[in-house]
Amino acid sequence: CSIQTFYTDGKISIDKNLKEKLSSIPLDPNKNYHIGSGQSSDSLAVGNREGVLDAQLDFARKNSNIILEFKTKSKNIAHLLKTDIPDNVFVSWSLNPQIFIDHEEHGTASLDQRLSCAKSLSDKGVLVGFHFHPIVYYEGYEDDYKNIVNKVMSMFEPHQIAMISMGTLTFIKPAINKLRSAGLKSKVLQIPMVDAVGKSSYTKEVKAEIFSNVYNEFRAWHNDLFFYLCMEESSIWESVFGDFYKSNVDFETALFESVSSKMKPLEIA
């Protein structure tokens, strides 16, 4: 994953004092926060070693003005299944065709395992979410992603899902250099890309096409779910959704209100 460029020594560490550090964060009680755990790693990769999951769950339990999102590509949900999960916590999975998982997402759970884990937590009453990220453009991608959408819609109801996001392959130069120097077997750097606001990604036209294709497969859920694009320009939002948020604050407010409305006792500050 390109986020490996966030780290310099390649080591994975676990913070033994996470609970204390979280409790020292100065949160404004009059503001709302959407906190994503696993943004540059994987929230469930190490389970509850050193109490890292319990520390985060306790943090969410004590702060009703936050939404805590665990982001993962794993099947490591054993601790969450046997633990009380606060209502303001949800778990999200990245979804991609199995062929992409096999060739690019080494060591992660299969597509069916991810969906099965999401269903297990959903059956427990835990809200789940899905990230179609990165959506990869290749011959036949439409049918592969349509298959994923059909699986999601057959296994879940809209009220069980916090949100669905979409994003594409986007690289900063250090990430490209890191992937090349690592010598990993990957085809992602063979994909034709252009400069996109200082990064390498698909053209705007290709992005609009792939986002629209996936979004339109969810047409029956358009009014019941919060859909958004990951780090895309307003012109692409408008092309896909017919509108865009005028500011990041507007987007964050809309996301928080939509997700929190599906969380039973969560109070909006």
Predicted regions and their residues:
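Conserved Radical SAM active-site core
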Residues: S2-S92
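Alpha-helix N-cap and loop-to-helix initiation/capping positions
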Residues: S13, N17, N48-G51, H106-Q113, ...
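Structured alpha-helical segments in the cores of large, soluble enzyme domains
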Residues: K21-D28, H79-D84, L111-K124, V214
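Hydrophobic faces of well-ordered beta-strands that scaffold small-molecule active sites
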Residues: Y33-S37, L68-F70, V91-W93, V128-F132, ...
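Conserved radical SAM core fold
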Residues: S40-L44, K75-A78, V89-T108, P134-E139, ...
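A conserved active-site cap/scaffold subdomain adjacent to cofactor or substrate pockets
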Residues: S122-F132, E139
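Catalytic cores of alpha/beta
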Residues: G140-M155, W237
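Auxiliary Fe-S-binding modules of radical SAM enzymes
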Residues: M153-A269
